[in-house]
Amino acid sequence: MNHLRLQILDQATCERLLERLANEAEWLDGSLTAGAHAKGGKRNFQINYDSALRKEIHELVERAMWNHPVVKGFCLPRKLHRFLISKTEKEGGYDTHVDNAYMSSGRSDLSFTLSLTDDTMYEGGDLEIDSISESYPIKLKQGEILIYPSTSLHRVCNVTSGIRTVCVGWIESYVQAENDRICLFQLESGARAVLAKHGRSDELDLIFLAYTNLLRRLGG
């Protein structure tokens, strides 16, 4: 499993944010924040990065991510950074691209998309992520987040009706290598499941010891 999908915001919070974005946001051409190779293929709008509303949403989403143990276990985050709020209207999308490896705010090991709109509010607009042999489309429900490797080619298909509004950003992990992160996540998840089912034991202490020392060794 190289991506994580789960709910981190409730519907009421998302609806409140959508209402504020509709009434207060200053929307700019989204291509202004695209890399040189992707600029021509980005057809969306983004809220002014310096606006108080963007900073408020950034803080809310970042807090929800830091407070979610599965997000922390999967990402092993050193830094969550460069939160952008974008909306894609009819005929808008974002052609195939890979995210920049380094930004002024940090390194991109993992990318995330948090959907403020529900998948019933628009048509088209699937996020497609390429694997070695195929592409798989993903459409998020309201309040769901998808976290995936920044090393992947991906795209946002054209929206055919409605409006797709999301918060996107990047994660710099303590563990840069994807396979190492996945192994650590599986080890910790298994250990915590055993702890919940059987309670503490000397044997389980050894597993947590191995996890901690592996994290220390693999982390940068």
Swiss-Prot record:
Domain Fe2OG dioxygenase residues, every copy: 79-173
Entry's Gene Ontology molecular function annotations: 2-oxoglutarate-dependent dioxygenase activity; iron ion binding; L-ascorbic acid binding
Lineage per the UniProt record: Bacteria, Bacillati, Cyanobacteriota, Cyanophyceae, Synechococcales
Gene3D superfamilies, A to Z: q2cbj1_9rhob like domain
Protein name in the entry: PKHD-type hydroxylase sync_1544
Family matches, as SMART domains: P4Hc
EC number per UniProt: 1.14.11.-
Keywords, comma-separated and alphabetical: Dioxygenase, Iron, Metal-binding, Oxidoreductase, Vitamin C
Species the sequence originates in: Synechococcus sp. (strain CC9311)
Coiled coil start-end: none
The protein's required cofactors: Fe(2+); L-ascorbate
Keyword GTP-binding found: no
